[in-house]
Amino acid sequence: MDNYSVQNFYNNDRKPLKPTTLHDGNIKKSVYEDVTYIRKLMCKEIMPGEHDHKFYNYGYNKENKYK
């Protein structure tokens, strides 16, 4: 699936007045399978960087860090 197809899915392939979740049959089955496959690859193949260790701490809360 190329960049145009992903952009087309998020901007054009949705039907009006229908939920926008990916899993409700809102798009063609082939596009659904492509999008879920890309999401799985992104989740598994993006390695954490050296600065990401702070996000794994139990008490880290970036939203309330400066309050």
Swiss-Prot record:
Highest taxon of source: Viruses
Family to which this protein belongs: Belongs to the baculoviridae 8 kDa protein family.
Protein name: Uncharacterized 8.2 kDa protein in HE65-PK2 intergenic region
Organism, as annotated: Autographa californica nuclear polyhedrosis virus (AcMNPV)
